[in-house]
Amino acid sequence: MGARGRRRDRRLVGIGIVVPHIRPGVAQLAFLHVSDGFRGTGIGRRLSNELDRIARSAGDTTMVVSATPSESTVGFYRRRGFEPTASPLPELLELEPEDVHLEKRL
């Protein structure tokens, strides 16, 4: 597992967690959050890029994420290269059946 955070004025304003190898060659972006007031400042993009590097360095070639089905959340992930998948991992679909399941090549 890899985690990264961002601080502003000693306050944690963004955090992300990636879980490498949930399947052979597949990492899961398990958590990504940027605090209100700091969204749109590039923090999420930088965290996402760092988590991509962690997954790639672990040998994964695909990243999956289960996203809250809001336009802004799905839009963020699509701008990061994710696309909706027609075949989400069953274990993620079971945990988050209402989410939008996306994946991208690393």
Where do the language-model regions lie?
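Conserved acetyl-CoA-binding loop-helix of GNAT-fold acetyltransferases
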Residues: 34, 40-55, 78-79
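Conserved GNAT acetyl-CoA-binding A-motif
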Residues: 55-68
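Conserved catalytic-core motifs of GNAT/GCN5-like acyltransferases
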Residues: 64, 83-100
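Short glycine/proline-centered loop/turn elements that form peptide/ligand docking sites
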Residues: 44, 48, 69-73, 90-96
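Exposed loop/turn and edge beta-strand positions of beta-sandwich/beta-sheet ligand-binding modules
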Residues: 23, 28, 59, 96-98
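Flexible loop residues that form catalytic
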Residues: 18, 37, 68, 85-90
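Acetyl-CoA-dependent GNAT
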Residues: 1-26, 30, 35, 48, ...
